[in-house]
Every structure is written in C-alpha cells, then in structure tokens.
From Swiss-Prot:
Protein name as annotated: Potassium voltage-gated channel subfamily V member 1
Organism ancestry: Eukaryota, Metazoa, Chordata, Craniata, Vertebrata
Disordered, as annotated region: 168-189
Domain comment in the entry: The segment S4 is probably the voltage-sensor and is characterized by a series of positively charged amino acids at every third position.
Membrane topology, as annotated: Multi-pass membrane protein
GO annotation, cellular component aspect: intercellular bridge; membrane; plasma membrane; voltage-gated potassium channel complex
GO BP terms in the entry: action potential; potassium ion transmembrane transport; potassium ion transport; protein homooligomerization
Cross-referenced InterPro entries: BTB/POZ_dom, Ion_trans_dom, K_chnl_volt-dep_Kv, K_chnl_volt-dep_Kv8.1, SKP1/BTB/POZ_sf, T1-type_BTB, VG_K_chnl, Volt_channel_dom_sf
Compartments where located: Cell membrane
Stretches in topological domain Extracellular: 232-238, 298-309
Organism of origin: Homo sapiens
Subunit text: Heteromultimer with KCNB1 and KCNB2. Interacts with KCNC4 and KCND1.
Skewed-composition ranges (Basic and acidic residues): 168-181
Cited Gene3D superfamilies: 1.10.287.70, Potassium Channel Kv1.1, Chain A (3.30.710.10), Voltage-gated potassium channels. Chain C (1.20.120.350)
Gene (UniProt): KCNV1
Length: 500
C-alpha cells in the first residue's frame, strides 16, 4: 500500500503540507490546466480537479475509479477502442482530449474516498449524516465494511438509528395524511369544519384551541380519578354523584370523537389511526356495558353471572382513557414509538430473562425441595421466585433458606441486573431520538402555520401584527434550542455528539 500511496502523489503540486485531511495531500488539485503525467488522468468532482494515478487505483479494481482507470489505460493502447466500454458509463461527462472526467458529486466527501485509495483505510466524514455518507461511498463502489474501526461504531449506531426512524418516509406519510384530512373544500360547511378541526387537533393554533386542549386533559384526569373512586366503595362517597360524573365525562369524550369524525373527509383512514382507535376503545365499553345490562333483565342466575363477568372485563378497558393523554403529550407518543421500534431489543431481553428464569428456578427448586415447610413446592413456584429476583423486585413471599439456595439467589439477582442493563442504552437512544424528532416536527408545523397565516393576511391586506423577520427568527431559535437539548441528552446518555 505505501507504493500505491506514492503513486497518488505523482504530481509536483503535492509537495505541500501533509498534515491535514482537508488539504490536497492525496492528489493534485488546482484551477489551471489538468496534469497528465505518465499514467495519470484527471477527475473533476464537484468543480475540483484531482490528478489520479492508474497504478494506485489498480489496487482497487472493483471500485468506480478502479474501473475507470482500466478504461483509461485501455484507451491508450492502440487498436483497443472497439472492445473498451465507454467511460460515460462510469462518469457524468468526459473530455478525452484533456484526459479529464467529470463527476457531479461532493468534492469534500471525495477527499475521504481519496484517503481510502491512498491508505486503504476509510474514515467517516463528520459533516454528513450516516445515510448520506453511505450513499457517497456506494456511488464510488466502496463497501461500508471498509470503514476503519475508529469510526465504525459511531457510523453503524447512527445508521441503524436513522434507518429505524425512517425520517423521510415518516414525513411523507404525515404530509400526505395531513393533506388528505385537511382538504375541507369538499363537503358541506368547509370553513366551519376547518375551524373546528384546528380547535380539536391543533392546540397551539388559537386561544380557543388551547382552552379546549386544557379542558380535554381535565376531563381525562377526572374520569380516571372517578373510575378509581367508584371501585373504592367508601362510605362517605356518593355513588350516584360519581355515576353522574361518569356520564358527563363519557358525553364529552363521545362528542369529541364524533366532531373529529364529522370534520375529516377520509373517514376510513381516520378510523385506522391509533389515537382514534384509543378514543373509540375508551368510550365503547361504557355503551356496551349499558347495552348488556339492559338486555340482562330477564336472564337466569347463571346467565346473570356470565353477564357480570363480561361487564367487569369491559369496565377494565376504561383504563385505556389514560392513553388519551398521548394526544397532548409528546413524551407518551415518543414512548409508543420507542416500544414499536425496539421490538428486537425487547424480544432479546425477554429471551435472556426466560433462559435465566428457567435455569435458576430449576437449580433453586432442587436445592430447597428437601427442606421441611419449604416455599419451593414446585418448579412453577420457583419460576415466580426467579422472575421477581431477576427483575430485582423481590416480594419475599418465596425465599431460600439453605446456604446453597442463597448462593444461587445471589447469582440469579446479579444475572438479572446484568441482563436488564444490556438494552437500556439502545432504548434510551431511541427514545431521545424519537422525542426530539417529534418536538422538531411540532415546531416546524407551528412555524409553518404562522407563516401561512401571515401570508394570508398580506394577501387580503389585513392588519399585520407580526413581522416576517421575527417569525423566521423565532423559528430558527426554537430549532437551535431543540438541537442543543438533543445534543446535551446524547452526551448525558453516553453518546457522542460527533455527528451533530
């Protein structure tokens, strides 16, 4: 590899400093006439000229430039033009007279490619995200497995996170869904429906929307507290008053859901959205319970018992009302996204716990079964003990008494601590990324609505109370603030802000 490195420095223009990656240390680069010394040829990448050596590139025959070097060398052999492929298959344009080949790519990223040709070690460009850098090196025919070990961990971690979040697809889906649901031109009362939709779905769009959002949160909290008090059966509580309060809360939730349903145009898509499914599940048990109780008047005792069990199960679903707060909480939505995106890590964690529980419960059972009045009466009982021990809960209802059993218990607890700690860093990184991505999107939507409102006022010659420059400045400041918080969160979680 040293010989190929010297071959790349075949031009007298490379007698300068070799101390910086950003300087032209790998090839000749200049504004003047291209150099064609010996086996050299010139590539023009993003407006910057680089003189490369065919001898150096021959060590990498499977890359784009390695193939181009073979084509250029073949052109210099007399009588070989008929069997040689066109260089335009490998570059965007070519000037055979000056032996110069053009590429419409980033010249800054190309320097890292040249460093790979010179040393055989590929480093990651700081200024590019992982997916953009991957696109660059794939274009030049370099595999990402060639990335040097000093950059590999950061690169693959950021790449996996970017692919999981899938920013582009998520943004496009949200925009198309936004446009579909916000098309109020079709149907009756478009202006009223649009204003009502803004109040229901955009808490920051107006004072009325903010008041509605606060009232909605209050009703959710009150309904949850009311559900808990109804189950307490305290003597000083008026159950009739609690039932009336339950009816009021359900009426609010029903009206909220019906208004949203009437506002949208694509109602099938509306019913498929997770927040709306949660809203529906929060109110359906109440009406199904009323229906079941009204139809059970003429049933037998056995049938009444079965109906009572159904009613109890339906009442349990009222706890789903807590999930309605996800409409007003970015943190809850981020938690849901994190759980769905970390299913592999969660599955791996459950697998580790299952293996540990199976092993330690069996060992503990055979260590304790000979003790009189032992609580380890069977292996399933030992499963419960191993589960509470590995998760560091330790209820104490089942505990070992022998020395051997206590040693096994110590190993079980220690294994649980180690197993639970393994995926925490990954899940924390995913949660932080989801949270700040949602915050950035919310900020972008708010600023877009403000600019749209300002543009509408300008078009109608209405009184303008804000300045366009101030709106833009607030947008930039909010984005910078969120980026700063994301960077600080990454550092505190053990990550590296090298990529931000």
């Amino acid at each position: 590899m040293p010989s190929s490195g010297r071959a790349l420095l075949d031009s007298p223009l490379d007698s300068g400093s070799l101390t910086s990656l950003d300087s032209s240390v790998f090839c000749s680069e200049g504004e003047g006439e291209p150099l064609a010394l010996g086996d050299c040829f010139t590539v023009n990448v993003g407006g910057s000229r680089f003189v490369l050596s065919q001898q150096a590139l021959s060590c990498f025959p499977h890359t784009r430039l390695g193939k181009l070097a073979v084509v250029v060398a073949s052109y210099r052999r007399p009588g070989a033009l008929a069997a040689v492929p066109s260089p335009l298959e490998l570059c965007d344009d070519a000037n055979p007279v000056d032996n110069e080949y053009f590429f419409d790519r980033s010249s800054q990223a190309f320097r890292y490619v040249l460093h790979y040709y010179r040393t055989g070690r590929l480093h990651v460009m700081e200024q590019l995200c992982a997916l953009s850098f991957l696109q660059e090196i794939q274009y030049w025919g370099i595999d990402e497995l060639s990335i040097d070990s000093c950059c590999r961990d950061r690169y693959f971690r950021r790449k996996e996170l970017s692919e999981t979040l899938d920013f582009k697809k998520d943004t496009e889906d949200q925009e198309s869904q936004h446009e579909s649901e916000q098309d109020f031109s079709q149907g009756p009362c478009p202006t009223v429906r649009q204003k009502l939709w803004n109040i229901l779905e955009k808490p920051g769009s107006s004072t009325a929307a903010r008041i509605f959002g606060v009232i909605s949160i209050i009703f959710v909290v009150v309904s949850i507290i009311n559900m808990a008090l109804m189950s307490a059966e305290l003597s000083w509580l008026d159950l009739q008053l609690l039932e009336i309060l339950e009816y009021v809360c359900i009426s609010w939730f029903t009206g909220e859901f019906v208004l949203r349903f009437l506002c949208v145009r694509d109602r099938c898509r509306f019913l498929r959205k997770v927040p709306n499914i949660i809203d529906l599940l929060a109110i359906l048990p109440f009406y199904i319970t009323l229906l079941v109780e009204s139809l059970s008047g003429s049933q037998t005792t056995q049938e009444l018992e079965n109906v009572g069990r159904i009613v109890q199960v339906l009442r349990l679903l009222r706890a789903l009302r807590m999930l309605k707060l996800g409409r007003h909480s970015t943190g809850l939505r981020s938690l849901g996204m994190t759980i769905t995106q970390c299913y592999e890590e969660v599955g791996l964690l459950l697998l580790f716990l299952s293996v540990g529980i199976s092993i330690f419960s069996t060992v503990e059972y055979f260590a304790e079964q000979s003790i009189p009045d032992t609580t380890f009466t069977s292996v399933p009982c030992a499963w419960w003990w191993a589960t509470t021990s590995m998760t560091t809960v330790g209820y104490g209802d089942i505990r070992p008494d022998t020395t051997t059993g206590k040693i096994v218990a110590f190993m079980c607890i220690l294994s649980g601590i180690l197993v639970l700690a393994l995926p925490i860093a990954i899940i924390n990184d995913r949660f932080s990324a989801c949270y700040f991505t949602l915050k950035l999107k919310e900020a972008a939507v708010r600023q877009r609505e403000a600019l749209k409102k300002l543009t509408k006022n300008i078009a109608t010659d209405s009184y303008i109370s804000v300045n366009l420059r101030d709106v833009y400045a607030r947008s930039i400041m909010e984005m910078l603030r969120l980026k700063g918080r994301e960077r600080a969160s990454t550092r505190s979680s053990g990550g590296d802000d090298f990529w931000f």
